[in-house]
Amino acid sequence: MERKNVESLFAHARDINALVIGDLMLDEYLWGRAERISPEAPVQVLDVTREEVRIGGAGNVANNLVALGCRVSVASVVGGDENGTILLHAFSGKGVDVSGVFEDPQRTTSRKTRVVAANQQIVRIDRESRDPIGAGYEEKIVGFLREQGSRFNVILISDYLKGVLTPTLLAAVIAVARERKIPVVVDPKGNDYTKYRGATLLTPNRKEAEAASGIAIRDEASLCRAGERLLATADLTALVITRSEEGMSLFLRDGGVVHIPTFAREVFDVTGAGDTVLAILGLALACGVGFADAAGLANVAAGIAVGKVGTSTVSPAEVIGSMGFQHSDSDAKIKNLDGLAGIIEAEKARGKKIVFTNGCFDLLHVGHVKYLQKAKSYGDVLVLGLNSDASVRRLKGEKRPLIDEAERAHILAALDCIDYVVIFDEDTPLRLIETLKPAVLVKGGDYTPEGVVGKDVVESYGGRVELVTFVDGRSTTNIIDKILRAYGEE
C-alpha cells in the first residue's frame, strides 16, 4: 500500500464501530531484577521494582482498536469480583462501551501474573475460570448483538478457551453477522474449527493450524494443504496463518495464496501479538481494504508488537514508521512526543540503534553541525530534543532565543544527520529520555558524565553516554559578540 492509502485508512478509523467478543482478563506484570538465589530453595529471587496491571485477552484487542482510533464496544462475561470491576473501570476510562459485558457472581475473572526480569518472563501465575458460560449469558450477549448490531462495521472474536465463546454463542453471533453482512474476524483456539463455521477470516498461528488441520507443516506444500483444509472446514472467505519469523500466509476461498515475508526484528515478548494482528485485520476489512493489503499491514504491526514487552498496543504512527516510507520534506521529521514515541518503538523493532541529544541550537553554526554529525555516527537514528522558546528564556535569559522554536526546528530538520526533532518545554530533557529510552545519549564535551541529565536512566537498561568535543571558538555567544562588535555602533 502507498503511504497516502495507509494514512487514509487510519484517518477513517474514527468512523469505524468495532465489536469485540471474547474472553476478558487482566494481565499483571511484576518487573524487577533477578540477581540472587533463594536460601530456601534453588529458585531465583525477584527484587520487584515496578508493578503494572493491563487489560488482556480479548480486552487487548479492544485496546489495540482504541489505539488505532476506532470506536469500540465489548461483549463478554466477567466475574462479580474485584478483577471484574477493575476491568470495567479500565474500559470506561478508555471510552470503550461495556454495555455488552455481563457479570456472573459465580465466575472468576481471569488474572494472569507475569514475573519479568531483564525483559524476559520468569514465571506466569494464572487465576481464572474455564467453565462455559450458562445459556442465560449466551442469550444476553446475542440479545445485545441483535439490538445493537446495526451500528457495527466489524466483529472481532478473540477466543482464549476460557468459557465465554461456547459453540452455541459462536454459531448465533456468526449467523447474525452474516444476516447483516458484517465481517467476522476470529483469533481461534482449540482444534475444532467447525465452531467458527461461516466466519469471514481466521488467524491461527502455525502450531494452531497444524493441530486444527491435522497436517504437520514442514514445507510450502504441506502449508498449503493445511490452509485449504481449514478454509473448507470452517467455510471461510479467507485464512491467515501467522508463521513467526517466516511472516504470514494468506489463503483465499478462490484458491489464491499470498506469502508475506517478515522483516528482521528483535523479539522480546510474543504476548498479545495475535491481538494486534486481529485488530489491524478487523480495521482494514471494515474500511474495505483487500485481504492481501490487510494481511500486509497486520504483518508489519505484529513485528512491532513482538518488539515490546507484555500486552501492548500498536499505533498508526508505528505502523507507518515501520513501512519504510521516506520523509517527504524536513517538516515530516518534526514530531510531538506522543507521535515520536510510537515511531521510535517501530525503529527499535526494526533493529535500529537510537541516539538522543538535546540543546537550544540558537543560531546554528559549524560547531553545531559537526557535533550533530558525530552524534549520528553512534547509531542509526538521531533524535534531537529542542528546547522551546520558553525553556531557552529560562536558561539563557529574556533576550534569547534569537530564532523562534518553529524556525529552529525546521532548520535542524533540514540536516541529513537528524532523523527526528521533538520540542520540549521543560528545563531538562529527562521526560523525553525516559519515554524514548535511547541506546546512546550524547552531550557536549563541556559536561562531565556525572552531570549529564538522563545518564542514570540510560545506563539502567544498558545504554551509554558519549561526550563530544566542540569545535574551538565556535558558539552562538561568540557569533552574537562578533555581530555586536561589527554593527553595535550603527
Curated annotation (Swiss-Prot):
Q: Which GO terms describe its cellular component?
A: cytosol
Q: Where is the active site?
A: 275
Q: What are the GO BP annotations of this UniProt entry?
A: ADP-L-glycero-beta-D-manno-heptose biosynthetic process
Alphabetically, the GO molecular function entries are: ATP binding; heptose 7-phosphate kinase activity; heptose-1-phosphate adenylyltransferase activity; phosphotransferase activity, alcohol group as acceptor
- Hey, which pathway is this one from? Nucleotide-sugar biosynthesis; ADP-L-glycero-beta-D-manno-heptose biosynthesis; ADP-L-glycero-beta-D-manno-heptose from D-glycero-beta-D-manno-heptose 7-phosphate: step 1/4; Nucleotide-sugar biosynthesis; ADP-L-glycero-beta-D-manno-heptose biosynthesis; ADP-L-glycero-beta-D-manno-heptose from D-glycero-beta-D-manno-heptose 7-phosphate: step 3/4
Q: Where is the signal peptide?
A: none
The EC number on file is 2.7.1.167, 2.7.7.70
State if Translocase is listed as a keyword: no
The entry's keywords? ATP-binding, Carbohydrate metabolism, Kinase, Multifunctional enzyme, Nucleotide-binding, Nucleotidyltransferase, Transferase
Which CDD domains does this entry report, sorted A to Z? RfaE_like
Q: Where is this region: Cytidylyltransferase?
A: 356-490
Q: Where is this region: Ribokinase?
A: 1-330
What the protein does comes down to: Catalyzes the ADP transfer from ATP to D-glycero-beta-D-manno-heptose 1-phosphate, yielding ADP-D-glycero-beta-D-manno-heptose.
- Family affiliation: In the N-terminal section; belongs to the carbohydrate kinase PfkB family. In the C-terminal section; belongs to the cytidylyltransferase family.
Q: How does it associate, per the subunit comment?
A: Homodimer.
Q: How is this protein named in the record?
A: Bifunctional protein HldE
The organism is Geobacter metallireducens (strain ATCC 53774 / DSM 7210 / GS-15)
